[in-house]
Amino acid sequence: MNMIVVNSYNEWDPLEEVIVGSVLGAGKMAFEPALSPFYPLNSEERSFHGAKVAEKEVMEAQEQLDNFAKVLENEGVIVRRPEVCDFCQPVKTPSFEVPFQNSSACPRDVLLVLGDEIIEAPMAQRARYFEYRAYRPLIKEYFRRGAKWTMAPKPTMSDELYTPNYSTENVYFDPVTHNSLTQFEPCFDAATFVRCGKDIFYQPDAVTNEFGAEWLQRHVGDRYRIHKMRFKDSHPEHLDTTLVPIRPGLVLTNPERPCLDGSIQLFKDNNWEVVDAPASIRSCLLYTSPSPRDAHES
Protein backbone atom coordinates (compact mmCIF):
# COMPACT_ATOMS: atom_id res chain seq x y z
CA MET A 1 0.00 0.00 0.00
CA ASN A 2 1.26 3.49 -0.87
CA MET A 3 2.18 5.73 2.04
CA ILE A 4 -0.03 8.83 2.24
CA VAL A 5 1.95 11.54 0.45
CA VAL A 6 -0.75 14.24 0.41
CA ASN A 7 -2.42 14.81 3.78
CA SER A 8 -3.35 18.42 4.57
CA TYR A 9 -6.52 19.64 6.25
CA ASN A 10 -5.70 23.11 7.58
CA GLU A 11 -3.42 26.14 7.31
CA TRP A 12 -1.31 25.61 10.44
CA ASP A 13 0.03 22.05 10.74
CA PRO A 14 3.84 21.58 10.48
CA LEU A 15 4.90 21.79 6.85
CA GLU A 16 6.58 18.69 5.40
CA GLU A 17 6.41 19.26 1.64
CA VAL A 18 5.36 22.26 -0.44
CA ILE A 19 5.32 23.58 -4.00
CA VAL A 20 7.09 26.93 -4.35
CA GLY A 21 6.20 28.78 -7.53
CA SER A 22 8.35 30.11 -10.35
CA VAL A 23 8.22 33.20 -12.57
CA LEU A 24 10.42 31.78 -15.31
CA GLY A 25 8.65 32.29 -18.64
CA ALA A 26 6.18 34.77 -17.11
CA GLY A 27 3.92 36.96 -19.20
CA LYS A 28 1.91 40.06 -18.32
CA MET A 29 -1.78 39.45 -18.79
CA ALA A 30 -3.64 41.63 -21.25
CA PHE A 31 -6.76 43.29 -19.93
CA GLU A 32 -9.69 40.89 -19.94
CA PRO A 33 -13.20 40.86 -18.42
CA ALA A 34 -12.09 39.12 -15.20
CA LEU A 35 -9.83 42.10 -14.42
CA SER A 36 -12.67 44.63 -14.64
CA PRO A 37 -13.10 45.00 -10.85
CA PHE A 38 -9.56 46.36 -10.54
CA TYR A 39 -9.55 49.18 -13.15
CA PRO A 40 -11.84 52.18 -13.75
CA LEU A 41 -13.85 52.12 -16.97
CA ASN A 42 -11.83 54.82 -18.71
CA SER A 43 -8.40 53.84 -17.39
CA GLU A 44 -5.59 53.22 -19.86
CA GLU A 45 -4.97 49.82 -18.24
CA ARG A 46 -8.12 48.56 -19.98
CA SER A 47 -6.30 49.01 -23.29
CA PHE A 48 -3.27 46.99 -22.19
CA HIS A 49 -2.55 44.18 -24.66
CA GLY A 50 -0.14 42.18 -22.54
CA ALA A 51 3.63 41.85 -22.75
CA LYS A 52 6.61 39.72 -21.97
CA VAL A 53 8.05 40.42 -18.52
CA ALA A 54 11.48 42.04 -18.67
CA GLU A 55 14.25 39.51 -18.06
CA LYS A 56 15.70 41.60 -15.22
CA GLU A 57 12.36 41.60 -13.41
CA VAL A 58 11.96 37.87 -13.90
CA MET A 59 15.41 37.14 -12.52
CA GLU A 60 14.92 39.40 -9.50
CA ALA A 61 11.58 37.79 -8.66
CA GLN A 62 12.92 34.29 -9.26
CA GLU A 63 15.83 34.98 -6.94
CA GLN A 64 13.39 35.80 -4.17
CA LEU A 65 11.44 32.60 -4.77
CA ASP A 66 14.65 30.56 -4.88
CA ASN A 67 15.80 32.10 -1.61
CA PHE A 68 12.43 31.33 -0.05
CA ALA A 69 12.77 27.73 -1.20
CA LYS A 70 16.21 27.53 0.42
CA VAL A 71 14.86 28.87 3.72
CA LEU A 72 12.22 26.15 3.73
CA GLU A 73 14.72 23.45 2.80
CA ASN A 74 16.99 24.57 5.63
CA GLU A 75 14.06 23.96 7.96
CA GLY A 76 13.74 20.40 6.67
CA VAL A 77 10.82 21.01 4.30
CA ILE A 78 10.79 19.16 0.97
CA VAL A 79 10.41 21.82 -1.74
CA ARG A 80 9.03 21.03 -5.19
CA ARG A 81 8.95 23.44 -8.13
CA PRO A 82 6.61 23.65 -11.15
CA GLU A 83 7.70 22.79 -14.66
CA VAL A 84 8.99 25.81 -16.60
CA CYS A 85 6.44 26.87 -19.24
CA ASP A 86 6.36 29.64 -21.82
CA PHE A 87 3.53 31.88 -20.65
CA CYS A 88 4.18 34.40 -23.42
CA GLN A 89 2.34 32.23 -25.93
CA PRO A 90 -1.17 33.30 -26.99
CA VAL A 91 -4.20 31.16 -26.16
CA LYS A 92 -7.21 30.69 -28.43
CA THR A 93 -10.28 28.58 -27.69
CA PRO A 94 -13.76 28.56 -29.29
CA SER A 95 -14.85 31.03 -26.57
CA PHE A 96 -11.97 33.50 -26.19
CA GLU A 97 -8.51 34.58 -27.28
CA VAL A 98 -5.70 36.18 -25.24
CA PRO A 99 -2.25 37.30 -26.47
CA PHE A 100 -0.32 36.47 -23.27
CA GLN A 101 -0.74 34.17 -20.30
CA ASN A 102 0.39 34.58 -16.67
CA SER A 103 3.02 32.55 -14.75
CA SER A 104 3.42 29.68 -12.31
CA ALA A 105 4.27 31.99 -9.40
CA CYS A 106 1.15 31.17 -7.36
CA PRO A 107 0.45 27.44 -6.94
CA ARG A 108 -1.96 28.25 -4.10
CA ASP A 109 -4.31 29.86 -6.64
CA VAL A 110 -4.38 26.76 -8.83
CA LEU A 111 -4.38 23.77 -6.47
CA LEU A 112 -6.75 23.20 -3.56
CA VAL A 113 -5.65 20.42 -1.19
CA LEU A 114 -8.36 18.84 0.95
CA GLY A 115 -7.01 15.94 2.95
CA ASP A 116 -5.52 13.47 0.49
CA GLU A 117 -7.13 15.10 -2.55
CA ILE A 118 -5.67 17.66 -4.97
CA ILE A 119 -8.31 19.70 -6.81
CA GLU A 120 -7.36 21.72 -9.88
CA ALA A 121 -9.36 24.93 -9.54
CA PRO A 122 -11.66 26.15 -12.35
CA MET A 123 -10.21 29.66 -12.40
CA ALA A 124 -12.03 32.60 -14.01
CA GLN A 125 -9.16 34.52 -15.65
CA ARG A 126 -8.68 33.62 -19.28
CA ALA A 127 -4.92 34.19 -19.25
CA ARG A 128 -4.66 31.47 -16.59
CA TYR A 129 -6.58 28.84 -18.57
CA PHE A 130 -3.55 26.58 -19.05
CA GLU A 131 -1.66 27.49 -15.87
CA TYR A 132 -2.32 24.04 -14.43
CA ARG A 133 0.07 22.55 -17.01
CA ALA A 134 3.09 23.70 -14.98
CA TYR A 135 1.94 21.50 -12.08
CA ARG A 136 0.79 18.43 -13.99
CA PRO A 137 4.09 16.50 -13.67
CA LEU A 138 3.94 16.91 -9.88
CA ILE A 139 0.23 16.08 -9.70
CA LYS A 140 0.74 12.90 -11.71
CA GLU A 141 3.57 11.91 -9.40
CA TYR A 142 1.45 12.52 -6.29
CA PHE A 143 -1.41 10.55 -7.85
CA ARG A 144 0.85 7.59 -8.56
CA ARG A 145 1.99 7.74 -4.94
CA GLY A 146 -1.56 7.52 -3.62
CA ALA A 147 -3.13 11.00 -3.72
CA LYS A 148 -6.59 11.61 -5.17
CA TRP A 149 -6.68 13.91 -8.20
CA THR A 150 -9.72 15.90 -9.28
CA MET A 151 -10.04 18.48 -12.03
CA ALA A 152 -13.06 20.69 -11.42
CA PRO A 153 -15.24 21.41 -14.49
CA LYS A 154 -13.18 23.62 -16.77
CA PRO A 155 -15.11 26.85 -17.45
CA THR A 156 -15.49 27.93 -21.06
CA MET A 157 -14.82 31.54 -19.96
CA SER A 158 -17.20 32.75 -22.63
CA ASP A 159 -18.57 36.28 -22.41
CA GLU A 160 -21.63 34.97 -20.55
CA LEU A 161 -19.48 34.42 -17.43
CA TYR A 162 -18.69 38.12 -17.01
CA THR A 163 -20.84 41.17 -16.26
CA PRO A 164 -20.52 43.58 -19.22
CA ASN A 165 -18.90 46.99 -18.63
CA TYR A 166 -18.27 46.13 -14.99
CA SER A 167 -16.50 48.56 -12.66
CA THR A 168 -16.04 49.09 -8.92
CA GLU A 169 -15.07 52.73 -9.42
CA ASN A 170 -18.32 54.05 -7.96
CA VAL A 171 -20.00 50.96 -6.52
CA TYR A 172 -18.24 48.30 -4.44
CA PHE A 173 -18.29 44.66 -5.48
CA ASP A 174 -21.35 42.89 -4.07
CA PRO A 175 -22.00 39.18 -4.64
CA VAL A 176 -25.74 39.80 -5.08
CA THR A 177 -26.27 43.31 -6.41
CA HIS A 178 -22.95 44.14 -8.11
CA ASN A 179 -21.05 41.00 -9.02
CA SER A 180 -18.36 40.93 -11.70
CA LEU A 181 -19.12 37.26 -12.42
CA THR A 182 -22.43 35.71 -13.39
CA GLN A 183 -23.58 32.23 -12.38
CA PHE A 184 -23.18 30.97 -15.95
CA GLU A 185 -20.73 28.25 -14.91
CA PRO A 186 -18.82 27.33 -11.74
CA CYS A 187 -15.46 28.96 -11.16
CA PHE A 188 -13.11 29.58 -8.24
CA ASP A 189 -9.49 30.14 -7.30
CA ALA A 190 -8.12 27.75 -4.70
CA ALA A 191 -6.84 30.72 -2.66
CA THR A 192 -10.42 31.89 -2.16
CA PHE A 193 -10.84 29.06 0.36
CA VAL A 194 -9.34 28.86 3.86
CA ARG A 195 -9.22 25.43 5.54
CA CYS A 196 -9.91 24.68 9.20
CA GLY A 197 -10.23 20.92 9.28
CA LYS A 198 -13.77 19.97 8.26
CA ASP A 199 -14.75 23.63 8.05
CA ILE A 200 -13.83 25.56 4.91
CA PHE A 201 -14.43 29.30 4.61
CA TYR A 202 -14.75 31.42 1.47
CA GLN A 203 -15.93 34.78 0.22
CA PRO A 204 -17.52 35.28 -3.22
CA ASP A 205 -15.07 37.49 -5.07
CA ALA A 206 -13.75 38.62 -8.44
CA VAL A 207 -12.62 35.09 -9.35
CA THR A 208 -15.08 32.90 -7.42
CA ASN A 209 -18.84 32.70 -7.83
CA GLU A 210 -21.42 30.90 -5.72
CA PHE A 211 -21.86 28.31 -8.45
CA GLY A 212 -18.22 27.35 -7.87
CA ALA A 213 -18.72 27.05 -4.12
CA GLU A 214 -21.86 24.98 -4.70
CA TRP A 215 -19.94 22.61 -6.97
CA LEU A 216 -17.24 22.21 -4.33
CA GLN A 217 -19.74 21.55 -1.53
CA ARG A 218 -21.54 18.94 -3.58
CA HIS A 219 -18.23 17.35 -4.56
CA VAL A 220 -16.95 17.00 -0.98
CA GLY A 221 -20.37 16.01 0.39
CA ASP A 222 -20.61 15.64 4.16
CA ARG A 223 -16.83 15.35 4.56
CA TYR A 224 -16.53 19.15 4.81
CA ARG A 225 -18.73 22.13 5.65
CA ILE A 226 -18.28 25.17 3.41
CA HIS A 227 -19.12 28.52 5.03
CA LYS A 228 -19.71 31.72 3.09
CA MET A 229 -18.33 34.94 4.60
CA ARG A 230 -18.59 38.56 3.57
CA PHE A 231 -16.08 41.34 4.26
CA LYS A 232 -15.99 44.99 3.23
CA ASP A 233 -13.77 45.13 0.16
CA SER A 234 -14.29 47.13 -3.02
CA HIS A 235 -12.89 44.36 -5.22
CA PRO A 236 -12.16 41.20 -3.19
CA GLU A 237 -9.86 38.47 -4.47
CA HIS A 238 -8.80 35.53 -2.24
CA LEU A 239 -9.89 35.18 1.38
CA ASP A 240 -6.34 34.65 2.65
CA THR A 241 -5.66 38.40 2.40
CA THR A 242 -8.51 38.99 4.84
CA LEU A 243 -8.79 35.99 7.18
CA VAL A 244 -5.96 33.66 8.25
CA PRO A 245 -6.29 30.95 10.93
CA ILE A 246 -2.96 30.83 12.79
CA ARG A 247 -3.68 27.78 14.97
CA PRO A 248 -6.72 26.20 16.61
CA GLY A 249 -8.38 28.95 18.61
CA LEU A 250 -6.68 31.93 16.92
CA VAL A 251 -7.63 33.67 13.67
CA LEU A 252 -6.07 36.81 12.19
CA THR A 253 -8.25 39.31 10.32
CA ASN A 254 -7.63 42.39 8.20
CA PRO A 255 -8.87 45.46 10.13
CA GLU A 256 -9.40 47.37 6.88
CA ARG A 257 -11.98 44.79 5.81
CA PRO A 258 -14.53 44.31 8.61
CA CYS A 259 -16.98 41.43 8.42
CA LEU A 260 -20.33 42.57 7.01
CA ASP A 261 -22.60 39.59 7.56
CA GLY A 262 -21.80 38.45 11.11
CA SER A 263 -20.19 35.23 9.86
CA ILE A 264 -17.04 35.91 11.92
CA GLN A 265 -19.21 35.17 14.97
CA LEU A 266 -18.88 31.45 14.21
CA PHE A 267 -15.26 31.63 15.36
CA LYS A 268 -16.16 33.53 18.53
CA ASP A 269 -19.00 31.14 19.34
CA ASN A 270 -16.46 28.30 19.24
CA ASN A 271 -14.04 30.10 21.60
CA TRP A 272 -11.64 31.32 18.92
CA GLU A 273 -9.81 34.57 19.54
CA VAL A 274 -10.22 36.98 16.61
CA VAL A 275 -7.23 39.34 16.33
CA ASP A 276 -6.79 42.26 13.93
CA ALA A 277 -3.50 42.31 12.04
CA PRO A 278 -1.32 45.44 12.27
CA ALA A 279 -2.01 48.08 9.64
CA SER A 280 -0.23 47.25 6.39
CA ILE A 281 2.27 49.28 4.42
CA ARG A 282 1.40 48.49 0.84
CA SER A 283 3.85 47.92 -1.97
CA CYS A 284 2.33 46.40 -5.08
CA LEU A 285 4.23 44.70 -7.90
CA LEU A 286 2.28 42.18 -9.93
CA TYR A 287 3.20 40.24 -13.03
CA THR A 288 -0.33 39.02 -13.48
CA SER A 289 -2.10 42.17 -14.61
CA PRO A 290 -1.45 45.57 -16.17
CA SER A 291 -0.09 48.30 -13.87
CA PRO A 292 -2.42 47.45 -10.98
CA ARG A 293 -3.97 49.96 -8.68
CA ASP A 294 -2.13 49.99 -5.39
CA ALA A 295 -4.96 50.38 -2.94
CA HIS A 296 -8.11 48.73 -1.72
CA GLU A 297 -10.55 51.25 -0.32
CA SER A 298 -11.42 50.51 3.29
Which residue stretches match the model-derived regions?
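The feature marks the mature, well-folded catalytic cores of soluble enzymes
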Residues: 1-289, 293
